[in-house]
């Protein structure tokens, strides 16, 4: 019943597409596959309480949304959290907690105390090592199962490294040394990044910029494989990603979502001349840009304004991806409570036109926030103004 109501509200507001998250950060799934467990519980807002809800139903969650979307004339896409395998929630949930044989899949962090498995850190989301060949094979196989559904598109979220401290495993070291022509790094990891460093130092260690280049290549190569996996099952499905618009610091997660013709090194000193070679925009049929600015920063030309995030992304992608849509996170955009409720409502209205005017479309993250605050009317008003 709820899916019918939710999609009807989205359709009435003027949305043309919905994206259904079918692999949360635990790494378990809400679609049919034999590769990993089904989601057994979720936390949801019930009234004013964030409550654990056990999943006892056995019906196909994704198929139910596909069926309802088709009835209502909406396009439907599935999204997965990609390089994740567990979450600390409920004492630890997900593949990395259940299956000790996959311990090497967990990303290795460059901590002050030494290189440490993410499983032994306070990071709540337990990431895989994106460079691990078995991880990549597992995820491509998972995507093949997902592509079997009647979907218009698939989006990869968290298709990245956890942060700048990842991944410093022996596997990544071996691959990097091979990438560098077979060198042996004598002072590892210090010649790349000092233990415990979580941001770029004033003086770059010997191999840091080549390491950033290598990480971008790891993600670029994976995206090519993932696209091939999806298109091999269903060539007509649109393949895409969901990324943050803050390109100026997105090196920290190893992602270059720009066009390969955008020469990053002309603008940022952390980028090598080869960094641009691993811009993966041309691999994508559609890209969602998280334009996650404050509700008080709708308009502008710089990062950390919604309009600026979208216009800068469109410029960097240079037409290599045909659909670039940006939009706000309306549930987490004012953590310091600087905006009034009316300012937030009007930011939703204004954000649609601000984003759509400078890129190819608009998305809103996410439906639960509109439902909780009963803000559908503001999305509807904004869409109407944007398409007039």
Over which residues does each language-model region extend?
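Aromatic-lined carbohydrate-binding/catalytic grooves of carbohydrate-active enzymes
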Residues: 15-57
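Active-site neighborhood of glycoside hydrolase catalytic domains
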Residues: 148-149, 153-157, 162-163, 167, ...
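Active-site-adjacent "subsite" loops/lids of carbohydrate-active enzymes
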Residues: 77-149, 197-208
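Short, acidic/polar
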Residues: 3-11, 133-145, 258-282, 306, ...
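Catalytic domains of carbohydrate-active enzymes, especially glycoside hydrolases
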Residues: 4-28, 149-153, 276-289, 355-362
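Substrate-binding cleft/loops of secretory-pathway carbohydrate-active enzymes
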Residues: 85-88, 164, 233, 238-297, ...
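Substrate-binding cleft of secreted/luminal carbohydrate-active enzymes
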Residues: 272-388
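Aromatic- and acidic-residue-enriched segments that line the glycan-binding/catalytic groove
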Residues: 30-43, 84-119, 159-198, 252-263
């Amino acid at each position: 019943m709820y899916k019918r109501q939710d999609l009807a509200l989205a359709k009435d507001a003027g949305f043309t597409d919905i994206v259904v998250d079918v692999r949360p950060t635990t790494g378990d799934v809400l679609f049919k596959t034999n590769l990993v467990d089904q989601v057994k519980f979720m936390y949801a807002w019930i009234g004013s309480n964030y409550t654990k809800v056990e999943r006892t139903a056995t019906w196909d969650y994704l198929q139910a949304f596909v069926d309802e979307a088709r009835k209502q004339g909406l396009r439907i896409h599935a999204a997965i959290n990609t390089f994740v395998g567990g979450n600390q929630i409920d004492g630890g949930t997900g593949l990395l907690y259940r299956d000790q044989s996959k311990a090497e899949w967990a990303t290795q962090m460059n901590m002050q105390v030494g290189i440490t498995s993410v499983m032994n850190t306070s990071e709540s989301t337990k990431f895989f090592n994106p460079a691990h060949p078995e991880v990549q094979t597992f995820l491509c196989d998972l995507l093949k199962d997902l592509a079997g559904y009647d979907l218009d598109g698939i989006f990869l979220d968290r298709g990245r490294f956890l942060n700048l401290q990842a991944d410093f495993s022996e596997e990544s070291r071996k691959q990097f040394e091979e990438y560098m022509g077979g060198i042996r790094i004598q002072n590892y990891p210090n010649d790349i990044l000092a233990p415990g460093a979580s941001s770029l130092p004033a003086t770059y260690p010997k191999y840091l910029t080549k390491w950033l280049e290598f990480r971008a290549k790891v993600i670029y190569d994976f995206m090519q494989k993932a696209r091939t996996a999806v298109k091999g099952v269903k060539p007509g499905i649109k393949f895409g990603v969901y990324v943050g618009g803050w390109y100026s610091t997105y090196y920290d997660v190893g992602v270059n979502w720009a066009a390969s013709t955008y020469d990053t090194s002309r603008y940022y000193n952390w980028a090598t001349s080869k960094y641009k070679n691993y811009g993966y925009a041309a691999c994508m049929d559609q890209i969602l840009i998280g334009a996650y600015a404050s509700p008080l920063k709708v308009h502008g030309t710089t990062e950390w304004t919604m309009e600026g995030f979208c216009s800068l992304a469109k410029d960097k992608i240079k037409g290599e991806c045909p659909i670039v849509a940006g939009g706000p996170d309306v549930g987490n955009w004012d953590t310091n409570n600087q905006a009034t409720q009316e300012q937030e409502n009007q930011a939703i209205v204004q954000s649609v036109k601000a984003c759509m005017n400078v890129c190819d479309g608009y998305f809103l993250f996410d439906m639960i926030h509109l439902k909780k605050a009963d803000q559908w009317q503001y999305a509807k008003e904004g869409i109407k103004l944007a398409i007039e």
